[in-house]
């Protein structure tokens, strides 16, 4: 990911304030609500029948936290995203057969959730930096598909 030193510092400073459980649960929940076809990868999660069920589902929240924790690993290793996400890329490609477009969708949903949580602190400049980061993470996760 091509970020200036200032952009990296801003991304890391915001990330240090992120509540992984809260933001992760909301981001994954929103992905499943906004793009309902993504629910097919989460058959074992129980009731995903409506937005309230999805957003209140403890398995969605728990997996969202796990996803966001992994994303945070990427934030701290921006110069080696492919290496950081190599195993997850392999898992999602070879075993789970997740459409790599879903990584881009989740990244965009995450940016929306960050904006919601951080309000005016999530400036257009910071959004631009995070868009670069989520695109880089999505590309790293899609790496094994090529």
UniProtKB/Swiss-Prot annotation:
GO BP, sorted A to Z: hydrogen peroxide catabolic process
Record SUPFAM superfamilies: Globin-like
N6-acetyllysine PTM sites in chain numbering: 59, 82, 144
Gene Ontology molecular functions: haptoglobin binding; heme binding; hemoglobin alpha binding; metal ion binding; organic acid binding; oxygen binding; oxygen carrier activity; peroxidase activity
List of residues that carry Phosphoserine: 44
Keywords: Acetylation, Heme, Iron, Metal-binding, Oxygen transport, Phosphoprotein, S-nitrosylation, Transport
Annotated residues for binding of heme b: 63, 92
CDD domains cross-referenced by the UniProt entry: Hb-beta-like
Domain Globin: 2-146
Any one GO CC term of the record: haptoglobin-hemoglobin complex
Pfam families on file: Globin
UniProt modified residues of type N-acetylvaline: 1
Tissues where this protein is expressed: Red blood cells.
Modified residues (S-nitrosocysteine): 93
Record-stated family: Belongs to the globin family.
Subunit organization: Heterotetramer of two alpha chains and two beta chains.
Biological role: Involved in oxygen transport from the lung to the various peripheral tissues.
Protein name: Hemoglobin subunit beta
Organism expressing this protein natively: Equus hemionus kulan (Turkmenian kulan)
